[in-house]
Amino acid sequence: FQKLIAVPLEMTGSHFTPVNTDGGHAPMLGGGLCTTLNDYIRFLKMIYHNGRFGNKEILKPETVQTMQADQVRNAVVAPGEYVEKALGQHHTGIYGLGEWRELVDETTGEAYQISSPGWAGAYPWINKREGVCGFFIAHVQGGSSKEDGFSSFYGSPVLSRTVSEIVGTNNK
């Protein structure tokens, strides 16, 4: 990670933490990234620009395209699951590689909004159609789902869509 991603992206405040600190443990990939908002935005911008950061190619465009392609064709997705509940769009092409394909063009099947939400309240997203990327962090006291129905896991995608609609390139 440091050599291939963090250093070329100038992510000076980012590293993965081990599962525990006793030694001999590999970094924890799911939820183990310690970073700053500025560093993470650099990563999102690189993905948005198909693997490029400034004049550097960090990932090949084909790699980003593969990450965002439907990896589990015709996945069984029950009505009312994450994408439909959060964004109102039911489709079975929700799984990319390390990314959720949240909003998909019905004609081409290409994802135009991707994300990688975490149950702990982190929600990075890219909306290619509107030219917007961002990162929400929500902290909810107690459990992740409240008696009034609020859930940071389902709430952040709604906020991302609202931000995309307000500041996106199609609205200027």
Predicted regions and their residues:
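Catalytic loop of the DD-peptidase/beta-lactamase superfamily, centered on the K-T-G motif
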Residues: 2-7, 12-172
